[in-house]
Regions:
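Double-stranded RNA-binding/processing signature
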Residues: 1-171
Length: 171
């Protein structure tokens, strides 16, 4: 993996990883893990991949989005729920992944097949990887919700800027 592209990604995330293996795991799709394990003659799960991180990242994302919405002065449970659900949708996460250039910079390690298959699954690959990266940041920061929240605020910057405009100028 290109160290320059990893550095660019860390800059975009606002988090320099102390343990780069956590980031590499977050960027490793199960298809790559399984192929690499089979090459080494190992069991499929011996090569760490993003699946567990995706689950953890999803939970952390939900909690931090709520905190960020409260910080934006969203006052009601209903509004927080609606806005959080919009921000955590796969399409929104895929937009974030596209801004991070996860596929474009070949940062997602995968063995999915040809380019057509990659493009067909691009939304899922990007959104899952964004969630996995959030988990990797959380673990790398010593389970710091504050550090993870700071990074989520940065990578969701355009979405929160748009939200603030809507809150200031409701239609």
């Amino acid at each position: 993996m290109d160290p320059v592209k990893i550095q660019e990604l860390e800059d975009q995330l606002g988090h320099p990883f102390n343990d780069k293996r956590l980031l590499i795991r977050a960027l490793t799709h199960p298809t790559f893990s399984n192929v690499e394990s089979m090459k080494k003659g190992e069991a499929k799960r011996d090569c760490p991949h993003q699946e567990t991180y995706t689950t953890l990242g999803d939970a952390i994302l939900k909690a931090d989005l709520i905190l960020l919405l409260v910080d934006c002065d969203v006052k009601t449970k209903g509004n927080i729920t609606i806005l959080k659900e919009d921000l955590e949708k796969n399409l929104k996460l895929a937009d974030v992944g596209e801004r991070l250039k996860l596929l474009e910079n070949n940062l997602i390690l995968h063995k999915i097949g040809n380019e057509t298959k990659v493009q067909e699954g691009a939304v899922t690959y990007r959104s899952d990887t964004v969630e996995a990266i959030i988990a990797a940041i959380f673990i790398d920061s010593g389970d710091s919700m504050a550090e993870t929240k700071k990074c989520i605020k940065k990578i969701f910057g355009p979405e929160f800027d748009e939200l603030k405009k809507k809150l200031l100028n409701p239609q």
